[in-house]
Amino acid sequence: MSVSAFNRRWAAVILEALTRHGVRHICIAPGSRSTPLTLAAAENSAFIHHTHFDERGLGHLALGLAKVSKQPVAVIVTSGTAVANLYPALIEAGLTGEKLILLTADRPPELIDCGANQAIRQPGMFASHPTHSISLPRPTQDIPARWLVSTIDHALGTLHAGGVHINCPFAEPLYGEMDDTGISWQQRLGDWWQDDKPWLREAPHRESEKQRDWFFWRQKRGVVVAGRMSAEEGKKVALWAQTLGWPLIGDVLSQTGQPLPCADLWLGNAKATSELQQAQIVVQLGSSLTGKRLLQWQASCEPEEYWIVDDIEGRLDPAHHRGRRLIANIADWLELHPAEKRQPWCVEIPRLAEQAMQAVIARRDAFGEAQLAHRISDYLPEQGQLFVGNSLVVRLIDALSQLPAGYPVYSNRGASGIDGLLSTAAGVQRASGKPTLAIVGDLSALYDLNALALLRQVSAPLVLIVVNNNGGQIFSLLPTPKSERERFYLMPQNVHFEHAAAMFELKYHSPQNWQELETTLVDAWRTPTTTVIEMVVNDTDGAQTLQQLLAQVSHL
C-alpha cells in the first residue's frame, strides 16, 4: 500500500466534496505537509486557483473573493504557524458573513507534543470563531469514504456565514507516484463522482418572517438606518425609505446614495437630534455602522421599537435597544414589508444635510485627504467598484462624500483592522473582474505591503491610492495624551512607496495637485494593470478639517 497515493485519494474526496457546495475559488500557500490537498486541488478542473506566499494575506485574499462571489472560498495551508496566520481573516468573515473553508494540513497525532518540527496543537486553535470545526483522522481505508464526504457535507450544508476549519493530518511519505491504492475505497461512492450534488444534503430552514404589525408601524414616524448591504439592496432600501417618507441615514457601505449626505456631520447638530427624537420606530437594515456621531445617536435614541434586519445571526446592537432582531435577507424582508406612500415628516434634517454638504464643498479645493474623501465619487471607474480601507480614510469618506446609489463598495468593517486590506482588495478585483479603486492609509499599506505581489495579477484596471499622512492620524481625533501621541499612537514611519511599487513592477505616481491626480487616473483606467498613487498630505490636515467641519455644522 502506498501511503502517499492514499493521502491524495483521501484529499481528492475532500476537494470534490467542496465543489458540491459552490466552491470555485481556492487559495493555496506553499507547503510540504499540505501536498495531498494541493495536488488534489490542482487536478480538479472545477477550481480557479490562487496562490500567495503569505498565509495572512492569502486568508484576506479569500475574504475578498468571498465578498464579491457570495460563495464559499477554500484556503489550503501547511502545518504550524501557517495556520495561525489565517486567524484575522477568519475573525473578519465571522463578523461580516463571508464563507471561508480553511483546509489546514497537520502532522499525524504521534508527532504532536513530542518536539517534532512544525508540529503544533491545531485542533480547536481558532476557539469559537469558526462556525464548525472538524478534526479529521489520519487517512485510512478503515474509515469509509462515505463517512468522510458526509462529514464535510454536514459542515458545509449548514454553513450560512463565517468559517469552517477542517484540520487534515497526513503521515509521510507525502510524495510518490500514484498507484492503485485506494481506488476501490473511492469507488464505493458510486456515481457520486459523476454527479454534482452533495452526498448529504442539509438545507437549514431560513425564511423571512413577516411582522404582522408592520401595517401599523409603517404609518408612524420612522427612521431608516442603512448599514452594510449589497449594491442592489442599497437601491431598494433608498426607494423604500423615500416611499415611507422616513429619513434615511446611510452608512458609507450602504450603497443607498446617501440621500441625506454628511450624516456624521449633521448628527452633531442639536436641531437634527431633536427632530429625530420624534421617531416612534427605527428600522436598521444592515450592520457595521461607521460614523462616530451615528453610533452616538444610535446608542442614545429611545424609539418605541428598534428593529435590526440582517442576514447575519447574533446580536448586532451594542446599545441593547428594546425591539426586534430579525434574521433575514434584506431584499426579501423589504418585499414582505412593503412601504406605504407617505409625506416626509422630517423638515429640519434635509436642510441641515444640504448645508453640511455645502460646507464641505466650500473646502474642496485644497489638496488634502479630507478633500480627496469628498471628491472620491468623481474618481470612481465606470462599471467598477470601490474598496475602502479602515481607520481615518473610511470615516472621512463616510462623513464628507456622497457615493452613487447602487455603486458597489467593499471594506473590512467587521473587526475593522488595518491588516490584510490590500490582499482583500485583490480578492475583490479578482472575483468581479471589474475596474477597482482602492484607497488606504500609509500604515495600512505598510502592514500588507507584500500583497503588492497579488496586485501584479489583475484582470481589469486597479488603482491603489495610498494616502500618506505619515502615521495613524486617526489618533489625532481622540483625546490621546499630547506628550505621548506621536511616539506611542501616531508612530510616523517617514516612508514613501515609490520603491515598493518598483520592486513589484507596478506603475507609480505621486501627484502634487488635483489636475495631476485626475490625469493619472484617466491613464490608469485605460490599461488592465495596477497603478499605485501615493498622495502625500499634511500630517494633521485631514483630522483638523473634519473637526472644523463638525464644529461649523453643529452651529448651523
Curated annotation (Swiss-Prot):
Is the keyword Nucleotide-binding assigned to this protein? no
Which cofactors is this protein said to need? Mg(2+); Mn(2+); thiamine diphosphate
Pathway listed for it is:
Quinol/quinone metabolism; 1,4-dihydroxy-2-naphthoate biosynthesis; 1,4-dihydroxy-2-naphthoate from chorismate: step 2/7; Quinol/quinone metabolism; menaquinone biosynthesis
Write out the catalysed reaction: isochorismate + 2-oxoglutarate + H(+) = 5-enolpyruvoyl-6-hydroxy-2-succinyl-cyclohex-3-ene-1-carboxylate + CO2
Q: Which keywords does this Swiss-Prot/TrEMBL entry list?
A: Magnesium, Manganese, Menaquinone biosynthesis, Metal-binding, Thiamine pyrophosphate, Transferase
One GO MF annotation is: manganese ion binding
Manganese listed as a keyword: yes
Biological process terms from the Gene Ontology for this record are: menaquinone biosynthetic process
Co-factor remark: Binds 1 thiamine pyrophosphate per subunit.
Q: Where are the transmembrane segments?
A: none
Q: What is its EC number?
A: 2.2.1.9
User: PANTHER family, alphabetically?
Assistant: 2-SUCCINYL-5-ENOLPYRUVYL-6-HYDROXY-3-CYCLOHEXENE-1-CARBOXYLATE SYNTHASE, PROTEIN PHYLLO, CHLOROPLASTIC
Question: What does the record note on quaternary structure?
Answer: Homodimer.
- Tell me, what does this protein do in biology? Catalyzes the thiamine diphosphate-dependent decarboxylation of 2-oxoglutarate and the subsequent addition of the resulting succinic semialdehyde-thiamine pyrophosphate anion to isochorismate to yield 2-succinyl-5-enolpyruvyl-6-hydroxy-3-cyclohexene-1-carboxylate (SEPHCHC).
Family according to the record: Belongs to the TPP enzyme family. MenD subfamily.
- The protein here is known as 2-succinyl-5-enolpyruvyl-6-hydroxy-3-cyclohexene-1-carboxylate synthase
The gene behind this protein is menD
